Curated annotation (Swiss-Prot):
Its EC number is 2.5.1.141. GO terms for cellular component: plasma membrane. This is Protoheme IX farnesyltransferase. The gene is ctaB. Pfam families: UbiA (PF01040). Pathway: Porphyrin-containing compound metabolism; heme O biosynthesis; heme O from protoheme: step 1/1. It comes from Leifsonia xyli subsp. xyli (strain CTCB07). The lineage of its organism: Bacteria, Bacillati, Actinomycetota, Actinomycetes, Micrococcales. It catalyses: heme b + (2E,6E)-farnesyl diphosphate + H2O = Fe(II)-heme o + diphosphate. Belongs to the UbiA prenyltransferase family. Protoheme IX farnesyltransferase subfamily. It is an enzyme of class 2 (transferase). Carbon 2 of the heme B porphyrin ring is defined according to the Fischer nomenclature. GO terms for molecular function: protoheme IX farnesyltransferase activity. Converts heme B (protoheme IX) to heme O by substitution of the vinyl group on carbon 2 of heme B porphyrin ring with a hydroxyethyl farnesyl side group.
């Protein structure tokens, strides 16, 4: 995999070991990886209807981090040209020169191969196969094909971010059932209300980089409406887990309350957008993270309760 890019990196002095390590970690997009792992472990607890084997959890977390980190590193390598244009990404290591293109590409491949081996040998090969699929979807389907061509880039590219729940379930059961499919659907429907508000804030960045995000092509009113529609579908999908996975009072209460709160925030964003008032898209962006965290905390705790 090689993408020709005109080099415009400012030369930097000799980089110390600690700074180099931090640059490699940054390449894996730790915040994104952290969010993915937040969905994996609760799914494993639900699949086991209790606390799964801790060594299995550790192997899954390590393998999952490597898998998501590999995808993130490939993404940084492929998108290094537009990262140099956007203010939001100007401090990434390939832009600053802390890492060379070759170092990033070798690191991405090494992490990807290591993730497959860790998941395959220490969990099972179904989980490893799903991990490979996640990397391919994010790198090829999203980064190479969709991102620069369509406003629906993050909708279908977001499939990669849904894979950890399938992987977590497969690790415990060596199969895929309806419960993880519903959780997959929740994350799939959550992705647009999460990322599109971000594109509203950084609209000019995406425009300058030539990335056709919905906020760039259609404007904030359309983004607000789409956020509302996806939010309603997401909340409805989250409620399907109650009968399918026999969820209890805690999950039901969290799904209803957190869902109602996020719907309110989504409608608020839309109403401000159509009234041409000042909007705070990052409020919905951060709210979406809080919502997903609460939902998966409930997924983890609910099976452990005696009622």
């Amino acid at each position: 995999m090689d993408v020709a890019v005109e080099s415009r990196v400012e030369p930097v002095g000799r980089i110390g070991v600690s700074r180099k390590v931090k640059a490699y970690i940054s390449l894996t997009k730790p915040r994104v990886v952290e969010l993915l792992l937040v969905t994996t472990v609760p799914t494993m607890i639900l699949a086991a209807r209790g606390i799964p084997n801790l060594w299995l959890v550790l192997a899954t977390v390590v393998g999952g981090y490597m898998s998501a980190g590999s995808a993130g590193a490939f993404n940084c390598y492929i998108d290094r040209d537009i990262d140099r244009v956007m203010r939001r990404t100007k401090n990434r290591p390939l832009v600053t020169g802390e890492l060379s293109d070759r170092e990033a590409l070798v690191f991405a491949w090494a992490l990807g191969v290591a993730s497959v081996l860790v998941l395959g040998f220490f969990t099972n090969w179904l989980a490893a196969g799903l991990s490979v699929a996640a990397i391919l979807i994010y790198v090829v389907f999203y980064t190479l094909i969709l991102k620069r061509r369509t406003t629906q880039n993050i909708v279908w590219g977001g499939v990669a971010g849904c894979m950890p729940v399938l992987i977590g379930w497969a690790v415990v059961t060596n199969s895929v059932g309806w419960a993880p499919v519903i959780l997959f659907g929740v994350i799939f429907l959550w992705t647009p209300p999460h990322y599109w508000p971000l594109s509203m804030k950084y609209r000019e960045d995406y425009k300058d980089a030539g990335v056709p995000m919905l906020a760039v092509v259609r404007g904030r009113a359309v983004v607000g409406l789409q956020v509302v529609l996806y939010a309603w579908a997401m909340v409805a999908c989250s409620l399907l887990l109650i009968p399918v996975a026999r969820m209890g009072v805690l999950y039901t209460a969290v799904a209803l309350v957190a869902g109602g709160w996020f719907l309110y925030e989504s409608h608020r964003l839309y109403n401000l957008a159509i009234c041409h008032a000042t909007v705070s898209p990052m409020r919905v962006f951060h709210g979406s993270i809080a919502y997903l965290t609460l939902i998966f905390l409930a997924v983890a705790i609910d099976p452990l309760l005696p009622f």
